[in-house]
A protein has these predicted regions:
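Canonical Radical SAM [4Fe-4S] cluster-binding loop centered on the CxxxCxxC motif
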Residues: 1-20
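A short linear-motif detector with a strong N-terminal bias
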Residues: 5, 21-23, 77-79
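SEC14/CRAL-TRIO lipid-binding/transfer domains and related phosphoinositide-recognition modules
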Residues: 18, 24-27
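Conserved AdoMet/S-adenosylmethionine-binding subsite of the radical SAM
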Residues: 26-34, 38-41, 46-127
């Protein structure tokens, strides 16, 4: 998607970044455990987090093994019930404590104006 009101697209750095394993990322996150307390944890957002669903599954499974709560912040644009993707999504949901589902607009026509995409798969995900 390319939403009309996306925060600071002029600051995006599409190239670069630092690749990390799930364990490396969790080791970094755990440095803040005293800040988030017993019920806190990690939130994965985007861009669109579901574009990296295999990594999310690994990350959230390992987070749960460490008693870290998990939150997925998503527009659910990639959501589909087709093929193996839905099986992966179900596996991810088993280790996701909270989902923040960002529906840009409930009406199809208004959603298209804002994002240039349909909201049908997003609403399907919400079901």
């Amino acid at each position: 998607m390319r939403c009309q009101f996306c925060h600071n697209p002029d600051t995006w750095q599409i190239q670069g970044g630092q690749e990390m394993t799930a364990d490396e990322l969790l080791n970094q996150a755990e440095k803040y455990r005293s800040y988030w307390g017993e019920k806190g944890g990690i939130t994965v957002s985007g861009g669109e987090a579901l574009l990296q669903i295999d990594f999310l599954i690994e990350l959230f499974e390992k987070a749960h093994a460490r008693s870290i709560n998990t939150c997925l912040d998503t527009s659910a644009q990639p959501f589909t019930r087709k093929g193996t993707w839905f099986t992966k999504f179900e596996r991810l949901m088993k280790v996701t404590d909270t989902v923040l589902l960002d529906i840009k607009h409930i009406r199809e026509d208004e959603h298209r104006k804002l994002t240039k995409f349909s909201n049908s798969n997003i609403l399907d995900c919400a079901r």
